[in-house]
């Protein structure tokens, strides 16, 4: 399963037309190149080979290309799972995300998405009364309490929390020196993240997001005109919860961060999905392990939790084992790759497209030998 929709762009930050699909220096450039048109294209190419009879699978093989993952999946994967399960019912699922390899003391490891944090999107609303902007004395300006609330959320981030999913990832990665121990200690991990940021800000952001509930105020709207006192303000906050956390934990954090003013703000739950995952064991995991040994000898799998949400969560609710994986050459490192997600100059190498398609093909073939 892949998605075909992409997020908007700011063209000023791009060195190419973000929607031209330009091929340059061995890369395909454009919005969605790694999120996730690369994997979707590889899946389509592999599915064609099975559909044409060139390769065979002893069961049903379904290819899904959905168009609203970036908007929450309500009209795509969620609709298919909830309203048309008979069409898409599956025991195993391959989807996003795939990343380049990570170097550790065990060698190069391929992160495989086996779990993901929970999207817990929130909206805050404040109300005031309109008036002339030239006479603000004793007015009720909705922007003022909203600005204070957003600032409080930014100034009071949640602390580190080490989950079993994170321990499993660090053990599989096995980074050099004392880094592994630092990354598993809630009292030392923030300092370790700061050190990582000097050399690799993309990796540092990943580590931080995988070990903290994250709270990111990303939109703020209020008022209608510069000379009118704002009678309404609205903010949207992207919250991502860790395994074991739920709606109550999110609300408790907002209340603690904002303080008594929280009770004067309208708090809206937009999305409330818990973290979810699949065990890194069983036929699909074994098929992936075999496929990697064939197409990337000497590399091993690292079960990873990702800080983003994917459409896999809808299938996992039905008991489907869902993983995200890809295979990439080493021209772009793990951290630099992550920085391109929803960023400028997104691109994927043509060699990586071929490698990912080969991995998918071998994985399906090896799974077919087991089921």
Named regions from a protein language model:
Residues 150-158, 178-184, 279-329:
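Active-site-adjacent substrate-binding region
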Residues 1-31, 40, 52-59:
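Acidic/His- and Gly-rich active-site-bordering loop/insert found
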Residues 272-274, 298-368:
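Zn-dependent metallopeptidase/amidohydrolase metal-coordination segment
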Residues 85-87, 91-92, 98-107, 112-121, ...:
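Acidic-enriched catalytic cores of C-N bond-cleaving enzymes acting on peptides and small amides
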Residues 233-247, 251, 255, 262-307, ...:
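Serine-dependent amide/ester hydrolase catalytic core
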Residues 27-28, 34-111:
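Acidic/histidine-rich catalytic neighborhood of metal-dependent amide-processing enzymes
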Residues 24-35, 301-302, 344:
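Short pre-catalytic strand/loop immediately N-terminal to key active-site residues, enriched for Gly-Thr
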Residues 45-52, 148-152, 239, 362-365:
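Short glycine/serine- and small hydrophobic-enriched flexible loop segments
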